């Protein structure tokens, strides 16, 4: 594989995470405007975003098989057509059913693209380089989370319709579409060259279960928290711009944290530092929820920084539970994380309707506490120390 081809594939991976991050994170910023557009209460409107998350979940789950049947390049190009149709549906359709269908299609496109992005990184890089590249790739999720809420706030403050936010997100997929030209993708399934060596199957162990629960609770907690921060902040009397700034501050700090931890993690045992980070994140989230308005920006900045490496560390630890990194194992943990994404508004919507945004934030805080417990319990059963020792690529 040529170096320019590797760079193109790596950038497709980066942008695939940016696309998913933009779609998922911008929800909290535009939810109120979309609710007004359809004359619905915000708590009811949040349920329709479950279609976006369901699309992401279904596509990540199915793409473990689809990648072996349909070439990756074909999937990405077809995804671009679906993206254009979905954004057009949001712009020109005025029914809630069409909105829900468009959100589902956006979720499908996003999930397929993200699963391809994750696969490409695990194929292109090995050993420690894989972990740091995954962390850097994941930072594009948070980079989009920093940029697109600011774009949304800018557009909405000027009374520009909410659907233009999704048109802007579509530009990310346009970049992916352009990168597919003159680019060779790894072949899979019937298109791949098969080696004669027999594949040795390994048992995953109970540590994978702990990591799967941690992944689900972490993503559900994180998105449950950040999706309702704008509504919570507005309830405290903050302006739309200030509420958007809190979300952007979180993702900016999250992004810088990922870059920092891609170096820091090399010097620590991954399970131990993951436990410390999960504990710190739970405490910082509690301080944000119970603290004064003046301290909120500082708490959300530190929360973003110290929670940034948690999810990627969970995935990396999962890949180290077997001697040979298993794509199905990594996909299983990714799927559990995506279930957390899908459940975000299923769980928090009724809580907000019944008890308000602060109750949703406290629920998210409880989920972070579960992540800490899972990471602590993992220390007694994890196989990563015996499997990661020889990996010095």
Curated annotation (Swiss-Prot):
GO terms for cellular component: plasma membrane. PROSITE patterns: MFS (PS50850). It comes from Salmonella typhimurium (strain LT2 / SGSC1412 / ATCC 700720). The chain crosses the membrane at residues 11-31, 51-71, 78-98, 101-121, 134-154, 162-182, 206-226, 245-265, 273-293, 298-318, 332-352, 361-381. It is found in: Cell inner membrane. NCBIfam families: PRK03699.1. The keyword Acyltransferase does not apply. Pfam families: MFS_1. Residues 1-10, 72-77, 122-133, 183-205, 266-272, 319-331, 382-393 are cytoplasmic. This is Protein TsgA. It is a multi-pass membrane protein. Keywords: Cell inner membrane, Cell membrane, Membrane, Transmembrane, Transmembrane helix. The gene is tsgA.
């Amino acid at each position: 594989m040529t170096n320019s081809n590797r760079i193109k594939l790596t950038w497709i991976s980066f942008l695939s995470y940016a696309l998913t991050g933009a779609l998922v994170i911008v929800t909290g910023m535009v939810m109120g405007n979309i609710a007004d557009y359809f004359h619905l209460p915000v708590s009811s409107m949040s349920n329709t975003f479950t279609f976006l998350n369901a699309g992401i979940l279904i596509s990540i789950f199915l793409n473990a098989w689809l990648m072996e049947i349909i070439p990756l390049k074909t999937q990405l190009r077809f995804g671009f057509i679906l993206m254009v149709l979905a954004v057009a549906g949001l712009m020109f359709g005025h029914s809630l059913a069409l909105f829900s269908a468009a959100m589902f299609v956006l979720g499908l496109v996003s999930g397929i693209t993200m699963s391809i992005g994750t696969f490409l990184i695990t194929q292109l890089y090995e050993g420690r380089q894989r972990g740091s590249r995954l962390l850097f790739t994941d930072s594009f999720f948070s980079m989009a989370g920093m940029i697109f809420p600011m774009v949304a706030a800018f557009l909405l403050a000027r009374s520009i319709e909410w659907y233009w936010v999704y048109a802007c997100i579509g530009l990310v997929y346009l970049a992916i579409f352009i990168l597919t030209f003159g680019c060779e993708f790894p072949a899979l399934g019937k298109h791949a060259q098969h080696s004669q060596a027999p594949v040795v199957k390994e048992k995953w162990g109970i540590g994978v279960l702990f990591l799967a629960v941690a992944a689900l609770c972490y993503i559900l907690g994180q998105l449950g928290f950040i999706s309702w921060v704008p509504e919570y902040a507005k309830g405290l009397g903050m302006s739309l711009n200030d509420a958007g700034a809190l979300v952007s501050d979180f993702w900016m700090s999250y992004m810088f944290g990922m870059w920092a931890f891609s170096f820091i993690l090399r010097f620590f045992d991954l399970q131990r530092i993951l436990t410390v980070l999960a504990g710190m994140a739970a405490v910082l989230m509690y301080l944000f929820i119970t603290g004064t308005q003046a301290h909120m920006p500082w708490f959300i900045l530190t929360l973003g920084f110290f929670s940034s490496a948690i999810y990627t560390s969970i995935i990396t630890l999962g890949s180290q539970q077997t001697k040979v990194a298993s794509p199905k194992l990594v996909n299983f943990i990714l799927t559990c994380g995506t279930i957390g994404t899908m459940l975000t508004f299923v769980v928090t919507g009724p809580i907000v309707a019944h008890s308000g945004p602060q109750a949703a934030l406290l629920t998210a805080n409880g989920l972070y506490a579960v992540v800490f417990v899972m990471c602590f319990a993992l220390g007694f059963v994890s196989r990563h120390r015996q499997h990661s020792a020889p990996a010095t690529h």
